[in-house]
Each structure stands twice: as C-alpha cells, then as structure tokens.
C-alpha cells in the first residue's frame, strides 16, 4: 500500500498527488512513468512522473479525470492508500546520458501542451539543476486550464505562455509561439522536446521539421496498460512498429505516424473498434488482466 501524502486540484478535473514511494523516488529519472492501481481489482493506470523527491521518498503524479480509473483516483484524499505503485518504467529522457558541458553548448526548446506541462517539468528541472538554461513554451486552450506555470517559470531560462483564445499572454498555439520566436525574434534551437495531445505534437513536429530542428516527442497519451501487452500503445516510427510504454515513451518526432496512432487511440475507446483492430492486426494478447478493456 502506498500513502497519498498530498493532493491538489490544479484546475478543473486535473489533479496532482504526492505518493509515498521511496524506492521509486530513488530510481526515478526524467521521462519515465509509473503504473498505479487504486485497489487490488482496479485498472492499471500509467502516469508520467511529474516530479520526485529522493529525500522525502515521494513521487508526484498529475492526471486528468477522463475515465473510470482516474475518476476513482480523484476521489482519494490525503492519508488514503493506493494498492499498487510500480516504477519507474520506460526509457529515461535521452539527454540525461549526454555530457553536461556539451549540453550547455546547445539551445533547447520545450513545448508543453495542456497536461503535457507535467512530464515536461522534471526534464526542465533536471536541466536547471545542471546549469543548462532552456526555453519553454507552455500552451493551453485558455488561462483557466494552465498548469505548472509557476514551477516552469522557476526552472526555465525563458518561459513563453500561450492561450488559444488569447485570455492570457500570447494568443495562439505553441506552434504559433515557436514560429514567432524563430522567424521574428531570431531564436535558434538545436533540439525541441514536445509533449502534449497527439494532434498538438503532430503539428508542432511538422513545424520543427520545416525549421530544421531535431525533435523528440513523448507518446504517453496513447498508453493503456504500460507493458506493451494490450497493444494500445502500438505506434509506427520510421516504418517500424514500436510500443510506447516499452520502447519509449520518447521517439523522434519527425518519424512518428501520428495519424495512425490517433486512429488507433480513437478505436480503442470502443469494443467495436478494438475488435476491428484485432481483425486488422491480430489479437496482441488474451487480455490477461492488463486493463486495456477499461478506460483510464
């Protein structure tokens, strides 16, 4: 059992929790995720690690209530316990293995959309702790849905906030802001890291390809069971089949087949769609308790 030591509602239907999990906190790296189960019979819910504190032995998760599992999790309070908290899982962000001095010579831009701000934060924080200043674009549909602005502002070299409706700061999308920085403000970037909704990552990656900026995306949104068994996170990258929760979650943003992934993501929301995928691709497994037949 794992204790919930703090809980906050960041904005409407988006929650943050600090979970007491010393072993996970000790080994966690930026870019990784965990699998949480509310109770012994509950669904497996994969969530990106939004922060970790090795001294306190806590791991921070951020989630949006979009299905049965996350709605049940949102009903938990401080002092309650969840049944399972497994991790860290997935491949850590590629840059943590690079030479620090070489990283300092590069210009990085992070683009976070919506709840994508949470998985972007530990990467930006890691950069800040190692003396590497990075630019961050934080985008949302409107001001009320923005999260992690204060945290990212402290860790980023420069933070650019955008809202689709213009209710706060720059009016436009993250792509619009990136275009403004490069084309009108003379910014030059050696690498872009993009995390957010699939459609946002698709169009922002199209822009970075046009601008000649190597790009990494995190495909956390398409994960269901977190082991690759259910096949929901199956994605084609550079013509090869990959599984986001095992081979990723990070991939070359210019090689991902976003349209295929979004189609599969939509089909996995219905039993009819899952059946059709089994006809097209074969039954990836016998649904042995992975949780893929439920929603998060």
Curated annotation (Swiss-Prot):
CDD domains: DHOD_e_trans_like1
Record-annotated FAD-binding FR-type domain positions: 1-95
Annotated GO biological process: pyrimidine nucleotide biosynthetic process
Pfam annotation, one family: DHODB_Fe-S_bind
Domain of life: Bacteria
Gene3D superfamilies from the UniProt entry: Nucleotide-binding domain of ferredoxin-NADP reductase (FNR) module, Translation factors
UniProt GO molecular function: 2 iron, 2 sulfur cluster binding; flavin adenine dinucleotide binding; oxidoreductase activity
Cleaved signal peptide residues: none
Protein name: Uncharacterized protein in adh 3'region
Species in which this protein is naturally found: Clostridium beijerinckii
Upper classification of the organism: Bacteria, Bacillati, Bacillota, Clostridia, Eubacteriales
């Amino acid at each position: 059992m794992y204790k919930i030591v703090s809980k906050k509602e960041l904005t409407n239907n988006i929650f943050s929790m600090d979970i007491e999990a010393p072993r996970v906190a000790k080994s966690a790296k930026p870019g990784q995720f965990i699998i949480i189960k509310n109770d012994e019979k509950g669904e497996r819910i994969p969530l990106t690690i939004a922060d970790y504190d090795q001294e306190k032995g806590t791991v921070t998760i951020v989630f949006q209530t979009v299905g049965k599992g996350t709605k049940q999790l949102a009903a938990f309070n401080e002092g309650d316990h969840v049944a399972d908290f497994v991790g860290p899982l997935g491949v850590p962000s590629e840059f943590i293995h690079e030479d620090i001095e070489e990283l300092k010579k590069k210009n990085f831009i992070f683009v976070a959309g919506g709840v994508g701000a949470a998985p972007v934060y530990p990467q930006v924080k890691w950069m800040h702790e190692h003396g590497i200043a990075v630019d961050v674009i934080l985008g949302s549909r409107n001001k009320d849905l923005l999260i992690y602005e204060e945290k990212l502002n402290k860790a980023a070299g420069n933070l650019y906030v955008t809202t689709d409706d213009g209710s706060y700061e720059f009016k436009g999308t993250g792509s619009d802001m990136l275009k403004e920085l490069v084309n009108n403000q003379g910014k030059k970037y050696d690498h872009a890291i993009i995390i957010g909704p699939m459609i946002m990552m698709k169009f922002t990656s199209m822009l970075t390809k046009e601008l000649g900026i190597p790009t990494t995306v995190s495909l956390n949104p398409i994960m269901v069971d977190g082991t690759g068994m259910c096949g929901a996170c199956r994605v084609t990258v550079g013509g090869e089949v990959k599984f986001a929760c095992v081979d990723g979650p990070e991939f070359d943003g210019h090689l991902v087949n976003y349209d295929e992934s979004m189609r599969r993501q939509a089909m996995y929301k219905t039993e009819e769609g899952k059946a059709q995928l089994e006809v097209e691709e074969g039954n990836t497994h016998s649904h042995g308790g992975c949780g893929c037949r439920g929603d998060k």
